[in-house]
């Protein structure tokens, strides 16, 4: 998985480097698919290795630090692009070549300087879905649906309803990254302190308020504040990953990470198309649908135990899909 992660990053960087050389529709389709394959395979393996390598009591804070580092890199990239294109006047072709080339060099350096870390357990080499992970699958699906409301329609609202320019939206992105840089590690520590159940309940209640407010807001500054808060809630999704880490068999992590990405993207493919039709006739209704998604997530989150473990995956077991009698890890909590 470690080698595959680096190969995926290299593939993404190659796609970025080639983008400037294909400034036409079919060419951009091909380079975007190449970048997307590299990105999505890397993110899947990244989640898998993080959950395997990092101890359960350290994982929330570590994932918060990961988000902070990603935000720092995004801010650095924004600043570099602005400086190189506005002050030095470099072309799109050179910009893409430079970004992809630097990324590829970094991947090679990482390949050379990091040792091959040992795997704590042998991972399944095939796709699997377990009945006792049903709650995690459900949370993952609605998380994908919620992400599309933010990525597609909240941004579109800022432009269409409030007349935000490219520069205004870019500034909002930078504020989002700055907030993540500051608060994501703190959110990770907070999740470790209060537990996955309370963290996700707070997130989904907050999202219901944000989505309903999107539908009602008339002030562009309040809308911008909602946009930043909405993005900050993404950091609380750390709790979903640590919930999986606590309930999953160690050898299931890699396969379950792949399955969860697939489930997440079922919503990512379907939701924008369906709600795009709704947007044409009633944009506010899109955000009420988003609030409904958040409500479904909230109802699911109430079924997370206070101390989830293998054998104690859910609070109520109406469908007999979880809490199977299983050997309990002597190093873990009893799940009471």
PLM segments and residue spans:
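Glycine-rich segments within core transmembrane alpha-helices of 12-TM secondary carriers
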Residues: 63-79, 263-271
């Amino acid at each position: 998985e470690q080698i595959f992660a680096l190969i995926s990053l290299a593939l993404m960087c190659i796609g970025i480097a080639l983008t400037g050389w294909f400034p036409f529709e079919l060419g951009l389709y091909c380079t975007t698919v190449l970048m997307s394959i590299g990105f999505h395979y890397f993110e899947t393996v990244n989640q898998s290795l993080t959950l395997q390598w990092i101890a359960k009591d350290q994982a929330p804070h570590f994932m918060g630090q990961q988000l902070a580092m990603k935000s720092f890199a995004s801010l650095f990239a924004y600043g570099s692009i602005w400086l190189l294109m506005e002050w030095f006047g470099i072309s799109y072709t050179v910009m893409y070549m430079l970004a992809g080339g630097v990324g590829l060099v970094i991947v090679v350096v990482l390949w050379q300087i990091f040792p091959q870390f040992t795997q704590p357990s042998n991972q399944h080499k095939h796709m699997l879905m377990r009945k006792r992970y049903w709650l995690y699958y459900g949370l993952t699906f609605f998380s994908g649906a919620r992400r599309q409301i933010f990525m597609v329609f909240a941004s579109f609202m800022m432009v269409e309803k409030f007349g935000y320019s490219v520069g205004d939206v870019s500034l909002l992105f930078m504020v989002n990254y700055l907030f993540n840089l500051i608060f994501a590690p703190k959110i990770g520590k907070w999740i470790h302190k209060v537990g996955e159940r309370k963290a996700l309940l707070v997130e989904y209640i907050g999202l219901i308020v944000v989505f309903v407010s999107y539908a009602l807001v008339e002030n562009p500054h309040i809308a911008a504040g909602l946009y930043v808060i909405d993005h900050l809630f993404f950091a609380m999704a750390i709790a979903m990953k640590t919930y999986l880490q606590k309930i999953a068999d160690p050898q299931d992590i890699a396969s379950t990470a792949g399955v969860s990405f697939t489930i997440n993207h079922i919503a990512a493919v379907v939701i924008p198309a369906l709600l795009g039709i709704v947007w044409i006739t009633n944009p506010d209704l899109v955000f009420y649908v988003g609030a409904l998604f958040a409500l479904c997530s909230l109802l699911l989150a109430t079924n997370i135990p206070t101390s989830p473990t293998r054998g104690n995956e859910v609070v109520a077991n109406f469908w007999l899909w979880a809490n199977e009698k299983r050997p309990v890890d002597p190093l873990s909590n009893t799940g009471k």
